[in-house]
């Protein structure tokens, strides 16, 4: 994200990261500080077995599990490159949410921070404007 958004925009948009204590976050200090020593963000960890402390991000995990069921072979479903990751992200972030009055995360981002949305579009992520075309199933990667 730091590379996609650029340092200034990243610092403005990602002041903190709240996560669990998964093994992927064992080097949190490297995520918090750039190689030049400047502060990138601050990471905070939820208590063990307290996923409710992460708020609505758990709902995103549920959507991700619709596409990538736990224990599935990610390569077998087509998750082999950045393009595949983008397809998953586009579908999850284009999914309308009741909590957002039927809007998607992409639509909210466009409204709250057009410069950030523009950077994601430049990276290759796009909103799926017709919600009927959003696919939250493993075969979404086979349709590319």
Indicate residue ranges for each PLM-predicted region.
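Acidic/histidine-rich, metal-coordinating catalytic segments
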Residues: 11-27, 47-49
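Charged alpha-helix within mobile-element recombinases
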Residues: 30-34, 40-130, 140-143
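Short A/G/S/P-biased low-complexity tracts
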Residues: 136-138
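Loop/turn elements at helix/coil->beta-strand transitions in domains of secreted/extracellular proteins
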Residues: 12-13, 39-41
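Glycine-centered flexibility motif
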Residues: 6, 22-23, 55, 71
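Active-site beta-loop-alpha junctions of metal-dependent nucleic acid enzymes
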Residues: 1-11
């Amino acid at each position: 994200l730091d590379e996609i958004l650029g340092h200034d925009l990243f610092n403005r948009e990602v002041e903190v990261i709240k996560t669990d204590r998964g093994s992927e976050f064992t080097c949190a200090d490297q995520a918090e500080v750039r190689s030049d020593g400047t502060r990138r963000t601050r990471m905070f960890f939820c208590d063990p077995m307290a996923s409710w402390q992460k708020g609505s991000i758990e709902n995103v995990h549920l959507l991700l599990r619709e596409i990538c069921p736990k224990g599935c072979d990610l390569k077998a479903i087509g998750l082999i490159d950045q393009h595949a990751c983008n397809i998953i992200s586009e579908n999850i972030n284009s999914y309308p949410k009741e909590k957002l009055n039927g809007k998607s995360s992409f639509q909210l981002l466009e409204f709250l921070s057009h410069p950030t949305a523009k950077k994601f579009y430049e990276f290759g992520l796009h909103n799926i404007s017709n919600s009927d075309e959003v696919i939250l199933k493993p075969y979404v990667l086979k349709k590319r």
